[in-house]
Amino acid sequence: MRINVDKYLFIGRKKSEFFSACRELGAVEFLAKNKLKDSENVRRISEGLKTLNLLTNKYSPSDLVLVKSGYLTTEQLLQEIFDLNHEITTITDSLKALSKEIFRVKPLGNFSSEEIRELTLKTGLSVRFFYKKHIEGAPLEVEEENVFYLATAYNYDYYVVIGVVSLSKDIFTEIEAPRSVGELREEEEHLQTLLRKKKARVCELYAYREELLEALCEQCNEQTLQHAEASTEDLFDDKVFSALGWVIVDRLTEVEKLCNSLGVYLERVQPDPDEVIPTYLENHGLGALGESLVNIYDTPASTDKDPSLWVFLSFFVFFSMIINDAGYGLIFLATSLFLSFKARKQVKHSLALKRFLKMFMILGGGCVCWGGATTSFFGVSVSYTSPFREYSLTHFLAMKKAEYYLKERPKGYKELVHDYPVLKDKKTPKEFLLAQGTSSGDSVYKAVVYDKFTDNILMEIALLVGVVHLSLGMLRYCRQRYSSIGWVVFMCGAYMYLPIYLQAVSLIHYALHVPYELGGQVGYYVTFIGLGIAVLGGIIQRGLRGLDEVTAVIQVFSDVLSYLRLYALSLAGAMVGNTVMVMSERFSPAVGVLIIIFGHTVNIALSIMGGVIHGLRLNFIEWYHYSFDGGGRLLHPLKRVICQKSQNI
């Protein structure tokens, strides 16, 4: 829920004691003059902590030391971490350069650079190395004196030249080789030994990670306290301070008690006209999960009702409908339970991880329920007479629709009988549903009526969910937007009238027993009544400008139709799952299992992407349009950061 926040003026003497007490209370956000910037100490500690955290990705758990080898101050620890990190980087770069140099001079063989220098000093003869392009079949030896062939490598011929020899620069290229491959390998071995020592030491410093984390928390607390104190205005030769701050209304009593104990005067003041009042949300249970989703897109304004619970429940329904597979839901459920057990220590100290796993578990349960209601399980075709199908929601509604068709004989019934004459003799809903036939271009016999009915039912459920979802949002916001009531009436009337206009049968006819002709006529008039109420509400609220409310009819229609994505995405996932199962049957069991695993893995990934993106989109775009202002900013009260120690790896 959203808790109101009021602006207060504080005047007192004991500035340090007051701000320290407010930090412990965590109910006041002080209006700072400048934006909070991390101090040099905070940046250094954060960088050092980041370096230690990255060790878990570079080294195995057995390499990291968890027992401290001695006492180190924070500054000593940071300096050693930075020095070691710099040295490791430098040595690693040197090893890469050495590796390239070894590769370059390897064809020259082993020689002593010291002996070459002595030879040059004693005789004055230089020793140089050259290479030329290797030509297959050409002689390797060179006719020039004091030019000796060494080796052929990398499609080049290598030579050593003693003394001054005139070689064609068009053919030969000199290669600098101050050290031989053997000398380079000795240096490489030395650097590798040094690198191992440095890495071993930095792994030992991992044991000090908790101390560094505590130091970071302490520095952050001190930094925020100083920043809050800097927001005050000193009066009467710095003997009195004044400060402005936002106070959580539900905790005003605690703030007043604190002020009385320190002799601080507080008075409520009005916010500036252009000032953004911060938003404070406080949720528990499912509402807390919804709050995490709400913060992804935008922050509610201070005038908004908290949409957290609404968003989560809607997302739960949308995600379940898009996944539309009980098998996938079982995988989500099992995975969340396994991770909750496997990472139970981390869950205790990570609120975000705890919320994610809880949400994943609930969504998995929703997918199981909706997949069971639509008889969808890993894309497997369920028999029309299976008990699993007979107790499903789609089967129940299909039976109701078949019963209505046989009783009322609407236009849709006549079209089906014309296309499938075998239906003419069917007297019971079950016989009518399960009658076998072939579709155009298809030679496989199947219950065509059953498939048509279930597809239409799922599509209409998606539209019905859209109407209900938008109506709830409009009613929730009707005090801020008077026309919302009219649009709710308009959508209800349109839902009753459109089946008559399209000469189709709707859920309201065979499930809710709304008379076909009468319901359509009532819906026709209710549609225009709702449109009139919407325009009237707009005029009452905005004057003559409210006449443009009539143009919103297109927006309302398009928003309702946007919910068809629930049906389209679920149908796409079901078709992919079914295709995977059909393909696997054409191969051997071993290959078939691989196809099933790969195909369903890809389908699950795509389904999750669609469920998350479109499940949230229907909330943030369609629903927010009628029930959300947004543009707010979260309240950040001054409070002490409590260091949560992580578990040992």
From Swiss-Prot:
Keywords: Cell membrane, Hydrogen ion transport, Ion transport, Membrane, Transmembrane, Transmembrane helix, Transport
Transmembrane parts of this sequence: 312-332, 360-380, 455-475, 485-505, 520-540, 556-576, 593-613
Membrane-topology descriptor: Multi-pass membrane protein
GO molecular function, one term: ATPase binding
InterPro entries given in the database record: V-ATPase_116kDa_su
Domain of life, per lineage: Bacteria
Summary of the function given for this chain in its UniProt record: Produces ATP from ADP in the presence of a proton gradient across the membrane.
Family: Belongs to the V-ATPase 116 kDa subunit family.
Protein name (database record): V-type ATP synthase subunit I
